[in-house]
């Protein structure tokens, strides 16, 4: 079978080793004669999966003891509502840092429950999109928390600064979690949809500081209530057990491959290979300033957009899948999350060279 590299922004590719283990264990997990997706979430066997998964994630991210780790459902979009409903505590104002589509989506949901102070941080630097330094963000004095999305997958923009504030910082890390080292203690809440760097769609990770667990609105549905979910150890209702199991396999894969430090080195190398080729070419371009280029999502355009369809068609035939850019911006996008090997990026660059030589 021809080797295929999946550049989809999400659901994204999973590590081959993880898929192979899941395949091997699919119909007879741990000698039980059943699949792990068929056993009770309250069985001792699955409780072990849950506990090991949480501990492995804590180890990888060095999560302090005064934080709860929740394995939730509903995707990051559910958290757009859950965050204000859990954190406002009767107040009405929160700061929202806007660097792109996903931050704006969070604002649209949050304004049903509070008055967001929206801080537009995108600026132009030498004709490229960049992010205003955090020290210049116009944060409000009376905001309950500051929300931001460190990586905008559609525009390929990464925020490298943290908000300068003494308020709880809330981060949508759906596309960056586990890709590079972070200091969890600097955040009040971190949430992430699983389908990029954690596992398959259907699972959402929430990491929340203990002192923020008792502020929820009285009308908040229990399935979104951080305090309820923490008290019930993420089993208030039946969790997505198979997605949880696969996430656990990914965590073990990460640990066995050197942890977050090794993964960050790997990711920076991959991104550099692709950006370096784009920058030296007049045939391709990337519109993001080098200070804010995403490690995970690399959008690029052709000098002649009429060739987009041909590029995507031939790339697909070459085993380079899902390179079409988001409908909002068009062009191409290569999502190179943790599971993407350097070999895949090198194959893409080689294809780009050959395509350029043929159609320049």
Swiss-Prot record:
Keywords: Amino-acid biosynthesis, Aminotransferase, Cytoplasm, Pyridoxal phosphate, Pyridoxine biosynthesis, Serine biosynthesis, Transferase. It comes from the Bacteria. Pfam families: Aminotran_5. The gene is serC. It comes from Aliivibrio fischeri (strain ATCC 700601 / ES114). It catalyses: O-phospho-L-serine + 2-oxoglutarate = 3-phosphooxypyruvate + L-glutamate; 4-(phosphooxy)-L-threonine + 2-oxoglutarate = (R)-3-hydroxy-2-oxo-4-phosphooxybutanoate + L-glutamate. The lineage of its organism: Bacteria, Pseudomonadati, Pseudomonadota, Gammaproteobacteria, Vibrionales. This is Phosphoserine aminotransferase. GO terms for molecular function: O-phospho-L-serine:2-oxoglutarate aminotransferase activity; pyridoxal phosphate binding. It is found in: Cytoplasm. Homodimer. One of its GO terms (cellular component) is cytoplasm. Catalyzes the reversible conversion of 3-phosphohydroxypyruvate to phosphoserine and of 3-hydroxy-2-oxo-4-phosphonooxybutanoate to phosphohydroxythreonine.
